[in-house]
Amino acid sequence: MKIMATGVFDILHPGHIHYLSESKKLGDYLIVIIATDKTAGSHGKKLIFNEEQRRFMVSQLRMVDEAIIGHEDDIFKTVYEVRPDIITLGYDQHFNDSEIEKKCRDLGLNTRVVRISKYDGEIKSSSDIRRRIIELYNR
């Protein structure tokens, strides 16, 4: 079963590892789609690493079978090319699960969307890391 996880993955942290590990448990092949610099920037993200560096880092994680950079213009172009059985979304990804499933059906895909639970640890996002660094250096 092919699982597709998506994200920016700029500053890798335990929340990312939780998301990808839980995604991998759902199937035998995990492909991770990395948001392009342009796509991430259009959502207000200020990136530390460029898309190729982010793809490389994610590709080195044990649970990841493949990491690719997504398409800028149409996210469903990547979905159609990958043809996943399941698309996993993180707790903080603002997509409508049923709309994604409907769009997949329109493309002739029988893809399910699964939300992955929030990581319980203290640092669970890149924003948490940025805040922590600022706190440490402003003491």
Curated annotation (Swiss-Prot):
One of its GO terms (biological process) is FAD biosynthetic process. It holds the Pfam family CTP_transf_like. Its EC number is 2.7.7.2. It catalyses: FMN + ATP + H(+) = FAD + diphosphate. InterPro entries: Archaeal_FAD_synthase, Cyt_trans-like, FAD_synth_RibL, Rossmann-like_a/b/a_fold. Belongs to the archaeal FAD synthase family. Its cofactor is a divalent metal cation. Homodimer. The gene is ribL. Pathway: Cofactor biosynthesis; FAD biosynthesis; FAD from FMN: step 1/1. The lineage of its organism: Archaea, Methanobacteriati, Thermoplasmatota, Thermoplasmata, Thermoplasmatales. The keyword Chloroplast does not apply. GO terms for molecular function: ATP binding; FMN adenylyltransferase activity. This is FAD synthase.
